[in-house]
Amino acid sequence: MSKIYVEIENEFGELARYKHHQNGRGFVSATSVVDPTAFVESSAFVEPDAKVGSGAWIGAGSWIDRGAVVGAGVFIGANVHVGQEARIGRGAKIGSHTRIGDRAMIVDGMHIAHDTVVGDDEQIRRSAPRPGRETGFAKAA
């Protein structure tokens, strides 16, 4: 069985190859690893070298950037940006319209409210139940 790829140009003029994920039909880079049990909404993107674990849900319009890791059972709402090389721990829940910064880390089971910004290099070790800017918890080393 052959796979059909789509080439999309990024902001640097580079072409990346994407295929539609079997669950949800979202765009998944040819070099990313997405578990077959994960669900990627049709308007979501998973960029090169990103990983999405089993049973994860990536909402409509969300963007998982290069090298990011989304753990098993994670729920990511609509229109979320997960930054480059960010880590989202198993079972975490990320509300809609949220930005997770580059290299940020959300530990297992955390809940991040909708409309929240987590800064670059931040480590979130407790849930952020209200919308807003979440910084200063513990800088990544």
Functional labels for PLM-detected ranges:
Residues 1-63:
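Extended, small-residue-rich solenoid/repeat segments and analogous flexible loops
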Residues 2-27, 72, 77-141:
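Glycine-rich hexapeptide-repeat left-handed beta-helix
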Residues 47, 53-54, 59-61, 65-73, ...:
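Alpha-helical adaptor scaffolds
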